[in-house]
Amino acid sequence: MTISAQVIDTIVEWIDDNLHQPLRIDDIARHAGYSKWHLQRLFLQYKGESLGRYIRERKLLLAARDLRDTDQRVYDICLKYGFDSQQTFTRVFTRTFNQPPGAYRKENHSRAH
């Protein structure tokens, strides 16, 4: 494994551990010790997707899990994963899961709740 691949793996691990807080590419680059441009280029090269897309998709997967496994309000889940409004969250969630959060919850909510 190259040094660059190790750096990206370390960054992915750090991102996954910090998805509960706002993550800006500038901050991630600073944390990694790279320029924003260089980090984004490396990430795309090794992961095959942009850094921003990776973060957004990970947050959406966690939000989907919360919709499925908890009774938290959609608005609270939206805020928990750093979306600036419920409207934005609903639009992005619908684009990813082909249904709005409320419908996703009704269809997938755990039997335990």
Swiss-Prot record:
Pfam families given in the database record: HTH_18 (PF12833)
Gene: ramA
DNA-binding span(s): 26-47, 74-97
Record-annotated disulphide pairs: none
Classification via InterPro entries: Homeodomain-like_sf (IPR009057), HTH_AraC (IPR018060), HTH_AraC-typ_CS (IPR018062), MarA-like (IPR050959), Tscrpt_reg_AraC-type_HTH (IPR020449)
Described function: Transcriptional regulator. Binds to regulatory regions of target genes, including its own gene, efflux pump operon acrAB, antisense RNA gene micF, and various genes involved in lipid A biosynthesis, including lpxO and lpxL-2. Regulates expression of many genes, perhaps including its own; activates various lipid A biosynthetic genes, and as a result of activating acrAB, confers multidrug resistance. Plays a role in virulence and survival in host cells.
PANTHER family, A to Z: REGULATORY PROTEIN SOXS (PTHR47504:SF2), RIGHT ORIGIN-BINDING PROTEIN (PTHR47504)
Superkingdom classification of source: Bacteria
Keyword check for Transcription: yes
Misc: Overexpression of ramA in various clinical isolates confers multidrug resistance.
Name recorded for this polypeptide: Transcriptional regulator RamA
UniProt GO MF annotations: DNA-binding transcription factor activity; sequence-specific DNA binding
Residue stretches making up the HTH araC/xylS-type domain: 9-107
Organism in which the protein naturally occurs: Klebsiella pneumoniae subsp. pneumoniae (strain HS11286)
NCBIfam families: ramA_TF
Induction annotation: Part of a putative romA-ramA operon.
Traits of the deletion mutant: Deletion in clinical multidrug-resistant isolate KP22 increases sensitivity to many antibiotics, including tigecycline, doxycycline, minocycline, piperacillin-tazobactam, ceftazidime and levofloxacin.
Source taxonomy: Bacteria, Pseudomonadati, Pseudomonadota, Gammaproteobacteria, Enterobacterales
UniProt keyword annotations, A-Z: DNA-binding, Transcription, Transcription regulation
Description of how the protein assembles with itself and partners: Monomer. Interacts with the C-terminus of RNAP subunit RpoA when part of class I or class II promoter complexes. Also interacts with sigma-70/RpoD in class II promoter complexes.
